[in-house]
Amino acid sequence: AGKCTNFFKNISVAEFYLEATPQIQEGDELLITGETTGAYETVAHNMHDAKGLPQTIIEKGNYFAIKTDKIIRRGDRIFILKPNDDTNSNL
């Protein structure tokens, strides 16, 4: 998981700090949530590091930016959506 640290409205780019998840990879499904934002799903693509360089993997403890179709607010949380691998589920 991570947290939004900035949003650049003129280019619709959100900057995040990855603080709990070991890494985010290109193609990961992401969920961004916030009190005003609600729940917004997107896919990790065209990620850039703090220096503005394109990256396919962002490691824990780093800042990164992604383009979004929605306004993201400082403090919004980002999570990776992964399928539930619980094969013992009795649903």
Each language-model region and where it sits:
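Beta-strand/loop-dominated core regions that host nucleotide or nucleotide-derived cofactor-binding catalytic loops
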Residues: 1-91
